[in-house]
Design a protein with these regions (language model features):
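Short hydrophobic/Thr-rich beta-strand motif most characteristic of the beta2 strand and flanking loop
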Residues: 26-34, 41-42, 103
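Active-site beta3 strand of CheY-like receiver
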Residues: 45-51, 56
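C-terminal output helix
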Residues: 107-116
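The feature encodes the CheY-like receiver
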Residues: 57, 66, 75, 87
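Conserved acidic carboxylate
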Residues: 9
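Charged docking surfaces used in two-component/phosphorelay signaling
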Residues: 16-24
Length: 125
């Protein structure tokens, strides 16, 4: 079965980066660039993993994480929060909202894939 990843990112270059990395892994992808469309995308796509930018247009990533985790149908989906605002208090608040993992931008391919492997329960390469 193909791993399904929902990429939530408003920056085109970052979306292209994630798409290229995950395509090399053979993951099935859905890309969303606007916070207002995320909850519908989660329901329609049923991802195995969500990568979530925290600063999005219309709805914050932190709020979306809380909503996804509150819903019994989506609460089990691991969410990797990715943000350019990488203060210790930011990370704590994002994890309290329900993020399973956290990465600060800029990030490397290895950092991204190691965290994804951990969240999906796959051996780290």
């Amino acid at each position: 079965m193909t791993t399904k990843v929902l990429i939530v990112e408003d920056d085109l270059l970052n979306r292209m980066f994630y798409e290229a990395v995950f395509n090399q892994r053979g993951y099935e992808l859905m890309l969303v660039d606007d916070g207002a469309r995320v909850l519908d995308a989660v329901g329609d796509f049923a991802p195995d993993l969500i990568t979530m930018d925290i600063h999005l247009p219309h709805v914050s990533g932190r709020k979306l994480i809380r909503e996804i985790k509150r819903n019994p149908e989506t609460a089990q989906i691991p969410i990797l929060a990715i943000t350019a605002y990488a203060g210790k208090r930011d990370e704590e608040g994002i994890r309290r909202a329900g993020a399973s993992g956290y990465l600060a931008k800029p990030l490397s391919i290895d950092q991204l894939l190691d965290e994804v492997d951990t969240l999906l329960g796959e051996p780290v390469h």
